[in-house]
Amino acid sequence: MRLNQVTVGATNFQESLAFYLKVGLRLIVSARDEYARFELPDGEATLSIHLQTTVPQGGPIIYFEVDDVDSTAARLRSKGIAFTEGPTDQPWLWREARLSDPAGNEICLFKAGENRRYPPWRLGPTAT
């Protein structure tokens, strides 16, 4: 099993579309100004936006792993994207920067290296 796609709400479709293009995602599907699907630059995963009247706050966080959090954040800031936090080193051994899309969906740019899947506190192979 693989995670292929995540869909998040967009309260202003055109604004959200422009935002994710600025972030660097590639538009692969767009339908009736209410649904769009993007392909990430690396890997096979996709992210979709779907027009909604409201988007619940405190929902899932979208994590994009990048090679260099600081340079990626600087590049996005130069395009007018504001960050709410970071880049900062976290106690769980990741470097992170956080931002929100126009609908308020939280996004975390991070670099974790081996600690993403194999942190020092990872459970053994028999854990369920």
Residue spans for each PLM region:
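Core segments of cupin and vicinal oxygen chelate
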Residues: 7-46
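Vicinal oxygen chelate
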Residues: 2-11, 38-39, 52-128
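N-terminal beta-strand motif that seeds the catalytic metal site of vicinal oxygen chelate
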Residues: 1-17, 60-62, 112-128
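A short, local hydrophobic-aromatic micro-motif
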Residues: 4, 28, 84-85
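Loop/turn position at the start of each blade in beta-propeller repeats
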Residues: 1, 33, 92-94
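Short, charged/polar, Gly/Pro-enriched secondary-structure boundary elements
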Residues: 43-48, 104-107
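Acetyl-CoA-dependent GNAT
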Residues: 29-31, 50-53, 111-115
